[in-house]
């Protein structure tokens, strides 16, 4: 060891070199991925290439909960409200997640409407071409049906609309930081103040 260099202290496994992922032929890998996508589209025809439909959910934590994204699957309550049996749903391209819970009415109604829209657009091919069962689409619809190559029913993030108002003297005097601090203090001392008020009322009655 010489000079003022960092002492090597690598925490590697004995055979770490076997697990190094390399990419020496990137153009060929790109071609391979494209061919794999095409083969998959042929294999799953006439289903959409994007996979099953997913619900609209809000992201977790305080930082991201204002953003909406695709979730894992629809809840059993959402399927019931849309009139879709839970065992039928995965067979017609609807993702189901029995762990997820509906915590808001708006989210519940949005996903129910999403399911109803999907159901109205859905074209169901018969398992056997010669035997048509109840629920299968008409021959005219089957003839005109094409495979959806793009993301079907994409989630659109609505931009909030802002209204311009005239600035008043009360608005200029209002201090948002002080207001937040005051409300926090009031919340923190609510229990103690209620207890003191109850004790004072008791003393007055005596």
Swiss-Prot record:
One of its GO terms (biological process) is translation. InterPro entries: Ribosomal_eL13, Ribosomal_eL13_CS. Signal peptide: none annotated. It comes from the Eukaryota. Belongs to the eukaryotic ribosomal protein eL13 family. PROSITE patterns: RIBOSOMAL_L13E. GO terms for molecular function: structural constituent of ribosome. Pfam families: Ribosomal_L13e. This is Large ribosomal subunit protein eL13y.
């Amino acid at each position: 060891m010489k000079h003022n260099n960092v002492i090597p202290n690598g925490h590697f496994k004995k055979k770490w070199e076997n697990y190094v992922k390399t990419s020496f032929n990137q153009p060929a890998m790109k071609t391979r991925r494209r061919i794999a996508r095409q083969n998959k589209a042929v294999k799953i025809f006439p289903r959409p290439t994007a996979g099953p439909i997913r619900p609209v959910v809000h992201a977790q934590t305080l930082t991201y909960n204002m953003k909406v994204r695709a979730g894992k699957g629809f809840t059993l309550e959402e399927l019931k409200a849309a009139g879709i049996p839970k065992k039928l749903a995965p067979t017609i391209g609807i993702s189901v997640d029995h762990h997820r819970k509906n915590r808001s009415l708006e989210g519940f109604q949005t996903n129910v409407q999403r399911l109803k829209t999907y159901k109205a657009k859905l074209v169901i091919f018969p398992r056997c071409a010669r035997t048509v069962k109840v629920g299968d689409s008409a021959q005219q619809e089957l003839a005109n049906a094409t495979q959806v190559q793009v993301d079907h029913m994409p989630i659109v993030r609505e931009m909030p609309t802002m209204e311009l108002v005239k600035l008043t003297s009360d608005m200029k005097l209002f201090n948002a930081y002080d207001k937040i601090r005051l409300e926090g203090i009031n919340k923190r001392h609510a229990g103690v103040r209620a207890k003191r008020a109850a004790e004072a009322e008791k003393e007055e009655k005596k």
